[in-house]
Design a protein with these regions (language model features):
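Alpha-helical transmembrane segments and immediately membrane-proximal extracytoplasmic
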Residues: 1-322
Length: 322
């Protein structure tokens, strides 16, 4: 007769119960990180619209706002927006230098890679305000970067107050990054893959489930708050036998043009880097961008609407070059 299966004594249940409780606690924290990430990105979008309305009296998108004002108005907004962003950074870095973390900015990707969870509060706040002024007045720096930074910052604050281990707190920071990317680009899966593989460089066992939960939570909330549309309007393309050759040629040409554009950006960065004064440096950049916008209002913003027009075949190549 076989011996009956041994039932663990209650005193032996604690390790299993404790492990399950820690896992559930981390998952609930990931839900909170996702909610905060959605709030951060949507809040930043709202603030951008507020700055846009104050600057132009329009809230229907940056390109539409640029087209609704005069060329002189566009040029002045570029100059004053750049100057304002520079002044915020100039005074903000002085204020940050008096804080406990100094004026050295902590990049959220580097913090995640190194297993940390603390970010520099003052530099993060000042950079976000500076970006808000720039984006709201038409600068083409992109709003997605500050959104992800704010989402990571909110997650960092959440991790500080929860009874977690340092590894779990770092996982919550990673959750904030994934939530921000998912909300900013309406692509939660891309946010998960970017953080776990491209940013961290590995799939950490204890972060996979929380990151999936956070990205899903933030995207669900964003989809409930707004009705996200595809970033680009894709046309219907009929494939023919020569399509593959055209695609290969376009890839080679685009790769070369992309390399040349990056080289131009690096050279411009070095030239502007010689200017020590942040207000003057950003103000000068704003003047140049404003003068271009005075002639071509489509350069306002990060180019989503223009790229969609290009995909539809409604924009000539010389406007794309501008």
């Amino acid at each position: 007769m076989e011996a009956p299966e041994r039932i663990p004594a209650p005193s032996e249940w604690h390790p299993f119960i404790g492990g399950a409780a820690r896992t559930v606690k981390l998952w609930l924290a990931a839900v909170l990180a996702g909610l905060l990430g959605a709030a951060a990105t949507q809040g930043f979008r709202t603030l951008i619209k507020g700055v846009e309305w104050l600057a132009t009296g329009h809230m229907g998108g940056l390109v539409a706002a640029a087209e609704s004002i005069t060329p002189l108005h566009r040029a002045l907004l570029g100059a004053f927006g750049g100057l304002g962003a520079g002044l915020v950074l100039h005074w903000g870095l002085r204020w940050a230098a008096r804080g406990p973390d100094g004026a050295e900015h902590v990049d959220y990707i580097e913090a995640a890679r190194e297993g940390h969870y603390l970010l520099n509060d003052r530099t993060t706040l000042m950079r976000s305000i500076s970006a808000l002024l720039s984006v709201g007045t038409g600068a083409s720096i992109g709003k997605e970067g500050p959104m992800v930074q704010l989402s990571a910052w909110f997650a960092s604050w959440l991790a500080r107050f929860l009874p977690l281990t340092d590894d779990e707190r770092n996982a919550i920071l990673v959750c904030g990054i994934a939530s921000g990317i998912g909300c900013a680009y309406h692509a939660p899966i891309a946010g998960v893959v970017f953080v776990l593989e491209l940013a961290l460089g590995f799939f950490a066992r204890h972060t996979i489930a929380p990151v999936l939960i956070a990205a899903g939570t933030s995207s669900a909330l964003i989809y409930w708050l707004v009705e996200p549309q595809p970033l680009y309007v894709m046309p219907t393309v009929a494939l023919v036998p020569t399509s593959l050759g055209v695609a290969i040629a376009a890839g080679v040409i685009s790769g070369g043009l992309g390399w040349a554009f990056i080289e131009m950006l690096e050279r411009a960065r070095k030239i502007f880097g010689r200017i020590d004064s942040l207000p003057f440096r950003l103000g000068l950049g704003g003047v140049i961008a404003g003068l271009i916008a005075a002639a071509v209002p489509d350069v306002w913003g990060n180019g989503y609407s223009v790229v969609s027009e290009v995909l539809q075949g409604n924009v000539a190549w010389h406007w794309v070059a501008v």
